[in-house]
Amino acid sequence: AKFKNQDDIEKAKKAAGIDYGKWYSDKVVYAYDYFDGTDNIKEAEKESHGMHVTGIVAGNPVNKAPNSEKVYGVAPEAQIMFMRVFSDRDKTTASALYVKAIDDAVALGADVINMSLGAGAGSTVDAGSDIIDAVKRARAKGVSVVIAAGNSNTFGRGFSQPLAENPDYG
């Protein structure tokens, strides 16, 4: 684990000039709701796309499933930094929140940033230059950035001639 204890993440926060966010456990080493400006990341919905994806990626079994099997994520020893950028109330956000969360993740030493932002059909063409620049800064620091391109088919759905540079079109 990169952060062995709460003191390690607090030192990283101090070095990065970050005075917000909360340590929850050895697994969830940092959490902050950028939209609400609080440490409370509990979502109103019982099932959340971002939380679900996090479980697929970094889930490690605490209890056995009903069939007595244990379910693991693809990287069960990974530590998590939850950085929420969407409102729980109306599912809105702002590009400045994406940028701040990306920059903070890099400053705190993230190896991978997953942005579960998928919508019906979208692309980086729709992202503002500030978000694209933040992703480029992260990549320049060696951070892998993974962004959902859509959750409902390919970008090309509904477009007779989708842009060739959109890699999710097959």
Question: What are these language model-derived features?
Answer:
Residues 40, 60, 82-169:
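Substrate-binding/access-modulating region of protease and related hydrolase catalytic domains
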